[in-house]
Amino acid sequence: MERLIPKLIGLYLNLLAVVAPSKAASIGFFLFCRPLRSKLAAHHHAFFDSAEKFCFESGGETIQAYRWGRGPKNVLLVHGWQSHAFRWKKYVEAFDKSRYSVYAIDAPGHGLSTGKTMTVPLYSQAVETLLGRVGELHAAIGHSVGGFTAVY
């Protein structure tokens, strides 16, 4: 059933696009901006517990942020749609924590951040707020919409 519903929604949007493309686009965008929040398992929390965790406010939501390492070079990891900071686990483990401070956030409506809506401008605002706290970046790495957000 979990796989059937997205397929039915896709079929509906494809059929609607034939007769009412603007309406199909509007509904598609509405759905895209409301991600399904995935459940966090014990191994996700164990990884998050290995970080220095902190929260900040952005766009009316509480954003969960993480920091690994205390190095002088700041790196930001920006996840994609319907994901959370755990997706960066292997990357975080690969960084030399004496040389890098590795930051990640859970986007609005994702992971441990609050909210039900996520758009690139909202996500970008959260990234900008974080950068106001941590300062200049050495690098940013993004996946999918996270990559778009990092350069928005």
Enumerate the predicted regions with their spans.
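Proline/glycine-enriched tight loop/beta-turn segments at coil->beta junctions
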Residues: W68-V75
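Gly/Ala-rich beta-loop-alpha elbow adjacent to hydrolase catalytic centers
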Residues: I141-G142, G146-A150
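Active-site glycine-rich loops that stabilize anionic/oxyanionic intermediates
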Residues: P72, G80-S83
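Conserved alpha/beta-hydrolase
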Residues: A85, V92-T114
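A short loop-to-beta-strand scaffold at the N-terminal edge of the catalytic core in hydrolase folds
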Residues: K53-R67
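Alpha/beta-hydrolase active-site loop
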Residues: T117-H138
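An N-terminal hydrophobic leader/cap segment in hydrolases
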Residues: E2-C55
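The conserved beta1-alpha1 loop
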Residues: L76-G80, H143
